[in-house]
Each structure stands twice: as C-alpha cells, then as structure tokens.
Amino acid sequence: MDMKKLIERINFLYKKSKEEVLTEEEKIEQQKLRREYIDIIKGNVKVQLEGVEKIPTPNRKN
C-alpha cells in the first residue's frame, strides 16, 4: 500500500473510532496499519542517517 492510501485509511479508522465503536477486525487492521506506517518511517530515517557523513572539525585551542 502506498503511503498516501495508508495514511488515508489510518485517518479514516481514527475518525470512525471517534464516532462509533470499531469492530474487532477494524481494530486489528488499525493496529497493523499503524505498525506498517511506523516501520516505513523508521526505514526512511535509517536510510537518511546511513547517508550522513561526519565532517571532521579542526582541533581548536581555546
């Protein structure tokens, strides 16, 4: 599922949960979608951090 559709579905289930009680299937789906979203974000952050290079700083005397 692409990120836009994932977020739309998460938001839909959240709004629905505020208006009425979610079924057990919907609660399970909501948990899975949230976990998938978090895993995608973690993966993106990891890739970005792996691409970061440390820039050496010159030794300074104060």
From Swiss-Prot:
SUPFAM superfamilies: YnzC-like
Keywords (A to Z) from UniProt: Cytoplasm
Places the protein is found: Cytoplasm
GO cellular component, one term: cytoplasm
Main location: cytoplasm
Keyword Hydrolase in record: no
Pfam family, one: DUF896
Family of the protein in this entry: Belongs to the UPF0291 family.
HAMAP family documented for this protein: UPF0291 (MF_01103)
Name of the featured protein: UPF0291 protein CLJ_B2839
